[in-house]
């Protein structure tokens, strides 16, 4: 991985500017955050700010100037997030969930009104950022990674890793309301006129980016946005773990992303297809009976078959369900072993010490034996029995 001196210089200059800008309150009250009021002490205490900051190819201010666009921005401990968050009226049935979430967040930001029935852009931004930070801790735990793992700077340098699970800079998320604006950003920044949700490896700063358009994905519901962001971040955090240097097995990464999304809210599902883009598939809230049927008919893809699938093109609708279930099984019954298995897989190095993604099927087979003490056939049997005993028939 190349990290040119000029890039480091640019990064540090921009960070210095950020610090200067943070000290100011926005002059106009209408631009002031309704959650933290841009209060420097409150922002500092909660390890967040509303920019400007370095982002994507340039920085948040330049993006707004170039595109004549006024999103809201937020930087937290592990993320930089920006975008449009249209006002959202909380549906009657969801009020309880949101009130509980807001009551919790009020402990950090006293100005929050937990009984509010409409979330403005600042509420939505702060709530999404909060959910993303919670997810970061959850993901790190699932990966079998200690919160202290990347805090030792000299150890990071020795291993050639950065502080963000192995990446050098924070994970980035961008949410556009309009498809056209999203396309314009994609063209300007990454040189691709894509409009589907996209993950991007920003090699200049060694960080992983994820973006989408609400209009394109027909996202109205706040939980649907939350789910699609968590799905994208599942991939990015997994990829970033011990540094993104080679591709992880597709069953593992897609299975994990589904597991995260479905654990958060099973009503909204995202499916990855080729080239890292995402698309929506059939709607089915409860996947468990469907997986049961596949096992009973002996039609579920086996571990032995799945470990060889190299691309999203080789994963059909039923495979998505099976991948999810296999992760559900491993994370629920063998969380510690799963973390060790995954950590070994992402940490592979060749004889010269370089990241090694070769012979991934052998590595997985050996990993199953070493960490779970199962051959792939044994793993298959264990999973099938567990799913039949655990999942409802209807
Ligand atoms: Zn705020």
Which residues fall in each region the model found?
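Short low-complexity stretches enriched in small and charged residues
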Residues: 27-42, 126-128, 212-217, 280-286
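Short, surface-exposed beta-strand/loop micro-motifs that present aromatic residues
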Residues: 68-73, 314-315
């Amino acid at each position: 991985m190349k990290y040119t001196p000029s890039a480091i210089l640019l990064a540090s200059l921009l960070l210095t500017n950020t610090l200067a800008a943070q000290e100011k309150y926005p002059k106009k009250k209408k631009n002031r955050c309704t959650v933290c009021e841009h209060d420097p002490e409150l922002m500092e205490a909660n390890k967040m700010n509303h920019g400007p900051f370095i982002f994507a190819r340039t920085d948040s201010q330049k993006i707004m100037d170039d595109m004549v666009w006024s999103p809201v921005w937020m930087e937290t401990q592990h993320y930089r997030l920006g975008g449009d968050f249209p006002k959202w009226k909380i549906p009657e049935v969801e009020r309880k969930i949101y009130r509980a979430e807001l009551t919790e967040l009020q402990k950090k930001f006293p100005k929050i009104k937990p009984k509010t029935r409409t979330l403005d852009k600042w509420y939505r931004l702060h709530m999404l950022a909060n959910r993303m930070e919670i997810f970061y801790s959850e993901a790190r735990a699932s990966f079998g990674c200690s919160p202290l793992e990347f805090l030792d700077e000299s150890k990071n340098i020795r291993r050639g890793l950065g502080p963000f699970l192995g990446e050098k800079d924070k994970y980035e998320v961008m949410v556009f309301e309009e498809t056209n604006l999203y396309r314009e950003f994609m063209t300007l920044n990454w040189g691709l006129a894509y409009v589907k949700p996209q993950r991007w490896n920003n090699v200049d700063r060694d960080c992983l980016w994820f973006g989408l358009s609400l209009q394109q994905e027909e996202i109205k519901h706040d939980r649907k946005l939350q789910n699609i962001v968590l799905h994208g971040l599942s991939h990015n955090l997994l990829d970033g773990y011990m540094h993104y240097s080679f591709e992880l097995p597709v069953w593992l990464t897609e299975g994990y992303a589904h597991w995260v999304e479905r654990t958060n809210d099973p009503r909204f599902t995202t499916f990855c297809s080729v080239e890292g883009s995402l698309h929506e598939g059939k709607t089915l809230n409860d996947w468990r009976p469907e997986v049961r049927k596949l096992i009973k008919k002996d039609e579920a893809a086996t571990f032995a078959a799945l470990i060889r699938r190299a691309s999203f093109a080789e994963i059909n609708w039923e495979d998505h369900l099976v991948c999810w279930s296999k992760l559900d099984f491993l994370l629920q019954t063998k969380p510690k072993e799963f973390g060790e298995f995954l950590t070994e897989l992402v940490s592979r190095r060749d004889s010269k010490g370089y990241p090694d993604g070769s012979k991934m099927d052998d590595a997985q087979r050996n990993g199953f034996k070493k960490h779970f003490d199962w051959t792939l056939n044994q793993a298959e049997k264990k999973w099938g029995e567990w799913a039949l005993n655990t999942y409802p028939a209807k």
